[in-house]
Amino acid sequence: MTSALMLIDVQRNMLEPPTPVPAAASIREALQDLLLRARGAGALVIHVQNDGPPGEPDEPGTDGWQLVFPASAGELIVRKDQPDTFAANPALAKDLAAKEITEVVIAGMQSNYCVAESSRGALKHGLQAILASGAHATYDENEPASAISAQIERELAAEGVSVLSFRKVSFDEAS
């Protein structure tokens, strides 16, 4: 299998003050670890950037909208304005197929929104989806963020997404 890393909404508004997700520092370290290993393996890296509506912290052009980890040469930046990256970018699955990508490692924010929906979108388009446990996060809602993320992992695993510790994820080089 040829792997790609999809970093979803790894934007300043989620990982930096004033509105970071709980455990932002450890999530950032996990995301950086995945990114460095993907780059080291020559895997394709896809940075997904959410375009929030006017006035939101991720409104295009604002500081909160900026990527935490700038894209390197050859890496893709795709923008979206809905939870499923694939629905927002109809050509993405075909572009990945053209690059012989069969597996997408998914990490980022928020577990119960864009991470979950993009994982489902990957499956819908015939890709193997791997959710990097420990490298996705959300905000506290009716229960702690960690409980929400764990529930999403269980739900996605039941739907066919592989859930693997970010430390155990390996990457195969893109052709």
Where are these regions (language model features)?
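Short, well-ordered beta-to-alpha junction loops that form the rim of enzyme active sites
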Residues: 50-51, 109
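Active-site-adjacent betaalpha module
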Residues: 3-4, 32-40, 58-175
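Short acidic, Gly/Ser-rich segments with clustered Asp/Glu that frequently serve as metal-coordination loops
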Residues: 13-17
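N-terminal nucleotide-binding beta1-loop-alpha1 segment
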Residues: 5-10
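A short alpha/beta connector and helix-capping loop motif
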Residues: 19-47
